[in-house]
Amino acid sequence: GALVAQCIHQKHTYKEYAGLDACAANLMRPAMYGAYHHITVLGKENALCDHTYDVTGGLCENNDKFAVDRNLPQIDIGDYVYIHDTGAHGFSMGYNYNAKLRSAELLLCEDGSVEMIRRAETPKDYFATFDFTGLFDNIK
């Protein structure tokens, strides 16, 4: 399996950061125990890996990183990155921290077709287990 995410932020300080629209809630292994996942910048597969990035998610946690000091081609806002070998770890280890919703899962079939095997979570899913009974009874 793979996680496909888009670069939506950049930060240029003492380090170069590429911020994705995915986060540790989508793939916990790098944040949890530093697991390595190869990263490909789609459309730049043959470009030189002459930039060094921390590839991060959008959570407010310092360990929300898919890669640290990773040599990659230049990543521009809007580029898609392909995080390899995520297997079944995405959804099974996923969580809703900071109200992050789980993403859809797609299956690439042997004939090249793509099927959605799990839809993305919605806010309705997120709040489905809350019991709002009586919550606003004392508010005037």
Predicted regions and their residues:
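Charged (often Lys/Glu-rich) extended helix/loop segments that serve as interaction or gating elements
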Residues: 1-140
